[in-house]
C-alpha cells in the first residue's frame, strides 16, 4: 500500500518540477507584428537562460501539444549518437528509391545520399526513417523519458511516429527540453552534444550562434494543398559559447508556403527585438 501511495506522489513531483520552465511569464506586445502575421495563428515562447524568465505570444497555447514533425530531429539525432546507430554525423546512407520513392512534395535535396549532418540540415525524412531499425525501441522509450519529451508515445518499429501525431509535444515542453539539453546535457555525452551542434548550427549573427530546426505537416494528412502547422525550435549562444535563450514557435497557416519561411523570420525578429540577437 505504501508503494502504491508513494509512486503517484513521486511522479507528481517529477512532472511538476520539470514543468516549472518559466520563473515569470510576460506577454509580448504583438501590435508591431499583427499586420504581417495576418491570419496565421502563432504561439511563441522564449526562455532567458540567465534569468529563467519567459516572454510569450498566446500564453493559452503554451501547453497545447502538437506533432513535432521534423523538430524531432533534434532529440532523434542525439538518440542516434548516444545509441551508436551511426558512428558519427558523417556516416552516409544511400537513398533507396524502392523503399523510399520520391513523393511530389519532396525537394530535390532529399533525392540523394545523405550523412546524418546533411539529413538534419536538409530535413531529409527518409534518412531518419532508416535509423529506426537501428535503434532498439527500449532506447527510444528511455531517451524520450530522459528528455521528458511531450507525451513520449510511439509504436515500436514505426518510422512515422513523429510525423503522424502519435508523438506530441507542446511549445512549453519544447523549450523545457532545450533548457535541459543546454543546461545539464539531459544525460547526453558532451562529445555527442558537440557533434549535434556541428549539424544544428544555422548561422552566426553579431557573434550570436543560432542552433535550430524547423518542422511542419499538413493539418489534414490527406491534403498537402490545405492548411499547415509548423515549428521553429532552438537556442542561442553568445560569443563565449554560453547559451542565452531557448525558444519555440508554433504556427498554423493556410498553406505550407505561408509558414515555410515566416516561422523562422518571425522568430528571429522577435528574438532580436527582445534583445537576444
What is each residue range found by the language model?
Residues 19-64:
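Beta-lactamase-like hydrolase cores
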Residues 82-99, 188-192:
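Short, well-structured active-site flanking segments
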Residues 78-86, 133, 176-183, 272:
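Short glycine/serine- and small hydrophobic-enriched flexible loop segments
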Residues 66-90, 119, 247:
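Active-site SXXK
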Residues 2-8:
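Sec-dependent signal peptide recognition
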Residues 20-34, 65, 133-138, 182-277:
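Structured C-terminal helix/loop/strand segments within mature extracytoplasmic catalytic/sensor domains
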Residues 14-16:
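N-terminal signal peptide c-region/cleavage motif recognized by signal peptidases
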Residues 21-31, 95-100, 104-187:
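Active-site-adjacent helix/loop patches that line small-molecule binding or acyl-intermediate pockets
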Amino acid at each position: 500500500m505504501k508503494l502504491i501511495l508513494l509512486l503517484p506522489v513521486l511522479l507528481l513531483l517529477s512532472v511538476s518540477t520539470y514543468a516549472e520552465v518559466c520563473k515569470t511569464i510576460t506577454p509580448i506586445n504583438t501590435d508591431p507584428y499583427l499586420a504581417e502575421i495576418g491570419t496565421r495563428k502563432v504561439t511563441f515562447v522564449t526562455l532567458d537562460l540567465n534569468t529563467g524568465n519567459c516572454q510569450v505570444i498566446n500564453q493559452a497555447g503554451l501547453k497545447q501539444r502538437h506533432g513535432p514533425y521534423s523538430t524531432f530531429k533534434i532529440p532523434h539525432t542525439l538518440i542516434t549518437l548516444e545509441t551508436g546507430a551511426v558512428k558519427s554525423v558523417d556516416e552516409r546512407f544511400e537513398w533507396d528509391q524502392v523503399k523510399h520513392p520520391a513523393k511530389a512534395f519532396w525537394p530535390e535535396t532529399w533525392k540523394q545520399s545523405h550523412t546524418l549532418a546533411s539529413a538534419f540540415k536538409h530535413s531529409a525524412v527518409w534518412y531518419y526513417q532508416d535509423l529506426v531499425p537501428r535503434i532498439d525501441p527500449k532506447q527510444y522509450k528511455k531517451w524520450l523519458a530522459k528528455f521528458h519529451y511531450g507525451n513520449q508515445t510511439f509504436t515500436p518499429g514505426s518510422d512515422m511516429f513523429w510525423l503522424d501525431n502519435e508523438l506530441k509535444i507542446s511549445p512549453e515542453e519544447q523549450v523545457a527540453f532545450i533548457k535541459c539539453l543546454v543546461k545539464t546535457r539531459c544525460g547526453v555525452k558532451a562529445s555527442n552534444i558537440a557533434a549535434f551542434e556541428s549539424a544544428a548550427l544555422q548561422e552566426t549573427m553579431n557573434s550570436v550562434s543560432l542552433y535550430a530546426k524547423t518542422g511542419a505537416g499538413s493539418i489534414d494528412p490527406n491534403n498537402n494543398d490545405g492548411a499547415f502547422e509548423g515549428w521553429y525550435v532552438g537556442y542561442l549562444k553568445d560569443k563565449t559559447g554560453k547559451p542565452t535563450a531557448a525558444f519555440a514557435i508554433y504556427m498554423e497557416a493556410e498553406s505550407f508556403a505561408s509558414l515555410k519561411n515566416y516561422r523562422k523570420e518571425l522568430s528571429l525578429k522577435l528574438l532580436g527585438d527582445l534583445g537576444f540577437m
